[in-house]
């Protein structure tokens, strides 16, 4: 896990992603979602979460409002949707597709496999710089921007700092301890909520990773009972 995250981080650096850059993530819940989020986190970059079900109008608003320079999409269907409105997102420079087999002749688009290859190729040269970024992150630095659903108007961005996430994790551990529960490397946690929500990222993903537990990813919220049996 650590090796993959650091390779992705070095690949991100190779295409110009820097600390404090805002990077959109618009993808279904998956292990890759977690890995790219952690890579951005370790770089000191800021993830901007976007539900993959949003329309191009709503997505364009979020990307323009946050001034995202980069966008990570989960598949080609989402990519096609974004490309139809690309001209209306002036800050967007490059799109990363979370597909190992994706190849593009468009300089604006890059597949995950190419990110990994760049990370492996440049890791020796980039690693010291990566460590300096990771180790200089402060509590008050932004970790993520989470947008509201927009049910009462256009979505609004909520900034969460690294301290906010650490505090959420501490709260989760304290809650479990209060009721005589714990989590360790012997446990498996089931992730079924969209990772665009902060609750699952902080209270499930990061707590599980910190504790060495395995994370299983549900096919969808509707299949949760079958996934638990598996």
Predicted regions and their residues:
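A short helix-loop-beta submotif of the ANL/AMP-binding
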Residues: 10, 22, 28-56, 64-70, ...
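Short acidic loop-to-helix transition motifs that present clustered carboxylates
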Residues: 32, 54-57, 78, 174, ...
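Conserved pre-ATP/AMP-binding loop-to-beta segment of ANL
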Residues: 97, 117-147, 154, 180-188
């Amino acid at each position: 896990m650590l090796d993959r995250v650091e390779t992705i981080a070095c690949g991100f650096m190779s295409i110009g992603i820097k600390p404090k850059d805002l990077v959109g993530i618009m993808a279904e819940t998956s292990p890759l979602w977690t890995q790219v989020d952690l890579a951005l986190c370790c770089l000191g970059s800021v993830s901007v979460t976007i539900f993959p079900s949003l329309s191009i109008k709503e997505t364009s608003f979020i990307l323009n409002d946050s001034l995202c320079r980069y966008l990570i999409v989960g598949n080609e269907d989402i990519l096609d949707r974004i490309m139809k409105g690309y001209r209306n997102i002036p800050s967007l420079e490059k799109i990363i597709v979370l597909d190992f087999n994706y190849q593009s002749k468009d300089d604006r688009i890059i597949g995950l496999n190419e990110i990994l290859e760049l990370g492996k190729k440049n890791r020796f040269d980039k690693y010291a710089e990566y460590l300096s970024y990771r180790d200089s992150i402060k509590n008050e630095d932004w970790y993520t921007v989470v947008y509201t659903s927009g049910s009462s108007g256009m979505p609004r961005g909520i900034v969460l700092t690294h301290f906010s996430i650490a505090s959420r994790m501490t709260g989760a551990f304290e809650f479990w301890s209060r009721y005589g529960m714990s989590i360790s490397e012997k446990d498996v946690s089931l992730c079924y909520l969209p990772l665009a929500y902060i609750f699952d990222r902080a209270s499930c993903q990061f707590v599980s990773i910190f504790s060495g537990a395995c994370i299983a990813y549900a096919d969808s919220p509707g299949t949760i009972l079958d996934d638990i049996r598996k």
